[in-house]
């Protein structure tokens, strides 16, 4: 339903060849770089997992996050080639799902996958609403961009639905408070939504509420 894909493991060279044969320009695309000795383009996969497209308001992919199969120091990494020859830095954007011009209300949370799952779980229910997912807590610069874009399409209210662990984690609480302040200062009605810590993220909450949908 979400159409996610796993990171390629065996066809990396063929993928690059097919893209070049189609006339795609890989210079400037995060994740691709050029080998100095051979001049060949390479796709830099640094860990296996699920690829999550980070989509802007127009539905265009600006970055790709990878949710790792095996978690070490972090669950996610951005597909990037910044430290390689002719490589490119990955820069995430506010991720939009189910947000359209004319919508008056959107929900704000953290994460591409969390936004996609929550929106998917709530579809067809009275709680169906578009989501904006910020890639990380805090992500103030992304939120500033989101506020400008949401204002441009007529959104009036933002439901702030960060993880319920803001009740015990100071960093998350401070970010939540700041999101509320920034949204109000930008002229939005801001509605902080709280639920029991048993369901950490809004995706967990919606999965519980709509599991029989």
Annotate each predicted stretch with a short phrase.
Residues 1, 25-26, 156, 189:
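Short coil/loop linkers at secondary-structure junctions
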Residues 11-153:
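Phosphate-handling DNA/RNA-contact segment within nucleic-acid enzymes
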